[in-house]
Amino acid sequence: KEMPNVIVKNRAQVFGYYDHNMLVMSERINDHLPKSKKYSPKQRLWYIRAKEVVISSGSIERPLIFGNNDTPGVLLTSAAKEYLKVYGVLVGKKPLIFTNNDSAYETAIEFKKNGIWPIVLDTRSNPDSEIINEAKSMGIDIRFSHVVIAAKGYKKVKSAEIAKISEDKKDLGKIENISCDCICVPGFWTPTIHLASQS
């Protein structure tokens, strides 16, 4: 912000990328203020012509899909970790973490550091990484080759149906019901390429 050749627009979003590096941006000027000036615009549309463009639009976390995954108490692991680390809020006291990658273990470790014992279900058969070994050394309950079949509970998660899954991911073992009050899911990350695909 202090650089003389940089303009920062905080409440703005680029939504179009056209020929010859022309971008279109919408800026929200005062729609967030409780009382705005009488004749000031709520939004402003910018047409930007750039010599060069750097797109850093990030990625979107995908959920894993299972029955009743729209029940209150089912959320992304990144959201659960954010609530805990930024706001000091536990999303549950008996969390179940259902994953197919290593990113969930960061959330499991955060739960454990805050006195909560999570259960981790990992679709992979025997993954090996530093963060998984750290979770194991902390005594976190990890069940490999397991999946969530469905969330159970009326108005909120009270339990989950889980099962062991075969190596080829086609067959399920015996279905069991385990008690939990939230289900955290990280599916993986999808790059946000919408602007890049317009250029």
Regions found by a protein language model. Give the residues of each.
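Residues forming the flavin
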Residues: 1-199
